[in-house]
A protein has these predicted regions:
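Interfacial segments of transmembrane alpha-helices in multi-pass membrane proteins
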Residues: 3-4, 401-402, 406-421, 425-426, ...
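Hydrophobic alpha-helical transmembrane segments of membrane transport and translocation systems
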Residues: 8, 527, 534-535, 571-592, ...
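Small-residue-enriched core segments of transmembrane alpha-helices in multipass membrane transport
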Residues: 12-15, 519-540, 551-558, 615, ...
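Transmembrane helices with small-residue packing motifs
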Residues: 15-55, 69-81, 92-102, 664-715
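Pore- and gate-forming transmembrane helices of large, multi-pass membrane proteins
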Residues: 187, 486-506, 525, 557, ...
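Cytosolic juxtamembrane regions of multi-pass inner-membrane proteins
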Residues: 556-600, 643-651, 855-917, 965-977
């Protein structure tokens, strides 16, 4: 073996790097185990806060090779959300709000209608929002230039009223893209300060979206606030209620007229004494500012009626704010925004809600309402003047946020506080009043604080977002997935079990089949596994459940390289060559097939990596790394081990006694029965098409949009009971499937619904979850808990579906081009592509036909698409190995009196042993994954299991016959002139009896040969 020393050095270097990076994982796990033990008392009770204190104490301390615990944690092989719990979020920066801001909040009805229509169109289009808006605006206002909307004073340095629509579009696209970049930086800063170990934040190219993965978080609502709050900080004056007395009295008149018009008979009870902060009636507060002095009975009665109508909705909770029962806030918003009511208030008056409710003495929750003074619609002081913000404690020991301002901010703050001594100044964050303290004296130093009824976490988050800065536009969550820690730990157990069992079975089978040589293969496979994990750790990759599936599958497929090598060595030994020469020639002959087969799977993995997100990205990562490490292990490690035997004068046996004659002298006729195989495949595909037309697929939530919840009950539950309990509260029947069980005695279900899927408001997720709990509460005596949740908006569902289709088409195109380049003949490309489409259609048919009939989910989702692409890669792996052997046999028999069908049949029989061993070992692994891998990948592993069986079938009974037919259709012979079939195959001569008058078809030729005693072209030693 040449360069043996160099390969040994390279292997040692790679091993040292892997040990170095994996050591961080072991140290991190050890410290976390110590923290868990420290936080668990003798009774077995676990204190999470105590564990966190232990970890925090070491966070900045050196714990390993000079690295702090924080650095060790960042370098460990991280676990994905599905294995340790956490939250996956995809944020979308609102382009509509950016355009509104650029227009100066233009109220043109056609402009706003175009924005609205663009939002609807974006749900089913890949066109940019700006182009959709511009097209809609052109339809609504064909004679109006975009410049009339966007040529504001703020934009005059870039465009003017004479600017063309093209110039305005360019500005809008630049601003939207710039806002996306700024939003990404701000979100990244917020997440980095949040303190999550190994967060993953990345842009999703071409989509204007940001993907965030936060392992281990257990407070989704806090994360939602952190990510979606725009951090718009404002300081503004507050109107006293007596200063707005005429307007509020007029609002009472409006409510009275509205009540009379509706002829409402039911009246809400007046709040009980003690529900207000002041104890004074609203009427008495307003009277302080009223100039009227009429005391006539009719006026008094009218005023009383107005006051009653007013206090039924708006309650007095202080001299600076009203209050509204939490359940009545929607109606209050409608009243305050009514044009008739809005006209009663000063032009600079705006209303804003407090961030928190308080409980009245009657137990009901009241939300305070403030009337703020914003001349020109803008606050006199905004958050862009803040230079620093820290969470601290006030003089009463309460958590607060202290802020420092720049020079301009300090000057404005001094002026604002000086003008409002003895009056309140409100501090708002994202249009919610956080505090409105009375100013005691002017504040000259640019310092201010936000204090109130806050927790330490709230002040920490508040200071975080203020320091990170204001988002250029609001963000909305278009996709969300929350995995509970319990579900994650179960996935870890299932993943470890399936991995260990699968790998042990493969190791055992290899030794059982190849005898002592199998031990060498197993050592190479172990090295492959070690390198794979080490490379993943060095790249900062995250291990997910599909990632574990990818590792186990790569081990199964890595067997193929060793099988190809061993089969070739066996052939050379049986030709009488020495062990040393047989090893050398065996590696040389096996290498083309190994490279070709792995390149096709590698290309499929690249497509998955480009188009995949979340769990599929994890699978693609491990698949790509696994292919590279398995190639290195098979080509170099196996060779080094065999060279060790050669140097010590030892030999090896490459087959067990029972396996030696298993495929010896096999003479199966693959070609002549090809029409039967075509018919079998056509029937299955036809049945699948009928099923798709009448039954369709069970689409996953990531393809159809909606909300999905995994719910665990204390006791066994039926899907019908869950469906019936939720139908009333959700307004429609949800989809309910058993999750993680066989349906009998199962206590987990997966609920999918479209409830509030289009609602991107701050409280939509919480309301949806509360509605689910409300419905499930009717199942008396069987408490339920939501273990995980997922939300996918309609826009992102469309994008996911589109990218999935493109990924499949791209994979087909890439593999076709590679086959064409490698084999230089269209016939082989046709066979490979037809076989790929055959495999995909068969899997689709099975998933449609058996959907709802099997005791596990057959949803078509992103994981399913990943399985399809992997199946295509595996099928190509198998097909290319077969094609390589066919090409070799055709070259060996060039110009001989043998037909193409006979040559191809012999080639297929010679590789039958390799096909069977590789297929069986891979199926063995997938069967273990299917049984023990857990619900997360059950549908995925089922698709893979069926796919490997179908892929093995198609390489022998579809791809190869297609090649034969493609060549047979051009049977020509012209007295020494190269025929079309010769041109297609690149051979010098066509076998005479393939085109003779005696046997004009492959079937006739085969029948003729069966009547004769023939010497097969296949070597007796081949198996």
């Amino acid at each position: 073996m040449q360069n043996r020393t160099g390969i040994l050095i390279l292997t040692g270097v790679i091993a040292a790097i892997c040990i170095y990076f994996l050591s961080f994982t072991f140290v991190s796990r050890s410290i976390k185990a110590d923290a868990e033990a420290y936080a668990t008392n003798k009774q077995g009770q676990f204190d999470r806060a105590k564990e966190q204190r232990y970890l925090d104490s070491l966070w900045k301390e050196p714990v390993f090779l000079g690295s702090t615990l924080q650095e060790v944690t960042e370098r460990e092989l991280g676990l994905g959300l599905d294995l340790q719990g956490g939250m996956h979020v995809v944020l979308e920066v609102s382009p509509a709000d950016i355009l509104r801001s650029l227009s100066g909040n233009n109220r043109d009805p056609k402009f706003n209608e175009a924005l609205k229509q663009a939002g609807e169109d974006q749900k089913t289009s890949n066109t940019s929002f700006v182009d959709l808006f511009a097209n809609n605006f052109k339809k609504l206002a064909p004679d109006t230039k975009l410049a009339t909307i966007f040529a504001t004073s703020a934009n005059r340095s870039k465009i003017n009223f004479q600017s063309s629509d093209t110039e305005v579009r360019k500005l809008l696209n630049d601003e939207v893209n710039g806002a996306f970049g700024r939003a990404f930086q701000i979100i990244q800063a917020r997440v980095d300060k949040f303190g999550v170990a190994n967060p993953n934040i990345q842009r999703l190219p071409g989509s204007g979206r940001i993907q965030i993965e936060l392992p281990g978080v257990d407070n989704p609502e806090r994360i939602r606030r952190l990510l979606t709050g725009s951090a718009k900080l404002e300081f503004t004056e507050v109107y006293r209620l007596n200063e707005l007395a005429p307007a509020i009295e007029g609002m009472g008149s409006y409510l009275l007229r509205e009540e009379t018009a509706r002829k409402a008979t039911a009246k809400a009870s007046t709040p009980a004494t003690g529900t207000t902060a002041q104890g004074n009636s609203l009427e008495s507060q307003l009277a302080q500012g009223s100039k009227k002095d009429s005391t006539s009975k009719s006026d008094t009665a009218a005023a009383s009626a107005q006051g009653t109508a007013l206090t039924q909705l708006f309650l007095p909770v202080g001299q600076d704010q009203l209050g509204v029962y939490l359940k009545d806030t929607a109606r209050a918003n409608a009243v305050l925004n009514a044009p008739e009511v809005r006209s009663l208030f000063p032009a600079d008056a705006v209303f804003a809600w407090d961030r928190k409710t308080f409980k009245a003495t009657d137990g009901k929750e009241i939300l305070p309402l403030y009337f703020l003074k914003k001349p020109g619609g803008r606050a006199p002081l905004e958050g862009d003047v803040i230079t620093d913000a820290t969470n601290d404690y006030d003089d009463r020991g309460r958590p607060e946020v202290t802020m420092n301002m720049n020079a301009e901010g300090a000057r404005k703050w001094k002026s604002l506080t000086a003008a409002n001594v003895g009056r309140p100044v409100a501090i708002l964050l994202d249009n919610l009043v956080y505090t409105a303290p009375n100013v005691q004296n002017e504040i000259p130093n640019g310092r201010s604080s936000i204090s109130g009824n806050f927790t330490v976490e709230e002040t920490k988050d508040m200071s975080n977002v203020l320091k990170a800065g204001k988002l250029p536009a609001p963000t909305t969550i278009v996709e969300e997935s929350v995995v509970g820690a319990t579900l994650g730990s179960e996935a870890v157990s299932a993943g470890v079990l399936s991995s260990v069992v699968g790998i042990l079975l493969v190791f055992g089978f290899v030794v059982f089949y190849y005898n002592r040589a199998g031990v060498i293969a197993d050592i190479a496979l172990l090295v492959n596994l070690f390198f794979l994990l080490g490379v993943m750790a060095s790249l900062g990759a995250v291990l997910t459940m599909p990632g574990i599936a990818g590792i186990v599958l790569s081990i199964g497929m890595a067997v193929d390289a060793n099988v190809l090598i061993f089969e070739r060595i066996k052939e050379e030994l049986e030709l009488g060559k020495t062990f040393k020469q047989a090893v050398s020639d065996g590696f040389k002959n096996a290498l083309p097939s190994i490279i070709d087969s792995n390149v096709t799977t590698f290309l499929t993995g690249i497509v998955l990596f480009i188009f995949g997100t979340g769990l599929i990205l994890g699978f693609a990562t491990t698949l790509i790394i696994g292919i590279l490490t398995s190639l290195f292990a098979a080509i170099f490690i196996t060779r080094l081990l065999l060279e060790y035997y050669i140097r010590n004068g030892k030999t090896l046996t490459f087959s067990s006694t029972w396996a030696k004659k298993l495929f010896a002298d096999s003479d199966f006729d693959f070609v002549s029965r090809r029409k039967l195989y075509y018919t079998i495949s056509s029937v299955i595909i036809g049945a699948g098409i009928i099923s798709v037309l009448f039954r369709g697929f069970g689409l996953g939530v990531d393809f159809k949009g909606g909300r999905s919840y995994v719910v665990r009950f204390e006791k066994a539950i039926t899907t019908d009971d869950v469906r019936n309990s939720l139908e009333g509260v959700l307004g429609a029947s949800p989809e309910v499937k058993t999750y993680g069980g066989t349906g009998i005695g199962a206590n987990q279900v997966k609920v999918t619904t479209s409830y509030l899927v289009d609602d991107n408001s701050a409280g939509a997720d919480k309301r949806a979850e509360a509605t689910i709990y409300k419905g499930l509460s009717s199942l008396k005596g069987n408490p339920a808990h939501i273990e995980s949740s997922q939300k996918v908006g309609p826009t992102i569902a469309y994008d996911i579906l589109t990218s999935a289709l493109w990924s499949i088409l791209l994979a087909v195109a890439v593999v076709f081009v590679y086959i064409l380049i490698r084999f230089k003949k269209l016939a082989f490309g046709y066979g490979a592509v037809v076989a790929m489409f055959h495999d995909v259609l068969i899997i689709l048919a099975i998933f449609s036909i058996f959907n709802g009939l099997l005791p596990f989910s057959l949803d078509v989702d992103q994981a399913f698409v990943g399985a399809l692409l992997t199946i295509m890669g595996y099928s190509m792996n198998d097909t290319v190995v077969v094609f390589d052997r066919i090409r070799e046999y055709l070259n060996e028999n060039r110009g001989k009196k043998e037909s193409i069908p006979t040559i191809i049949n012999n080639a297929l029989n010679s590789t039958l042993s390799r096909t069977a061993v590789t297929g069986f070992s891979t199926i063995l692994v997938l069967l273990v994954l299917f049984i023990f891998g857990g619900e997360t990948i059950r549908g995925f592993s089922f698709a893979m299991l069926i796919g490997v069986i179908v892929g093995t079938y198609s390489s022998l009974f579809v791809a190869t016959p297609i090649v034969v037919d493609a060549l047979s259709n051009d049977q020509e012979k012209d007295n020494g002139t190269p025929t079309t079939i010769e041109k297609k195959t690149g051979f010098d001569a066509i076998p005479a009896d393939f085109t003779s008058a005696e046997a004009t078809t492959p079937e006739e030729f085969t029948a003729k040969k069966e009547k004769k005693a023939k010497t097969p072209l296949i070597r007796p030693s081949q198996s």
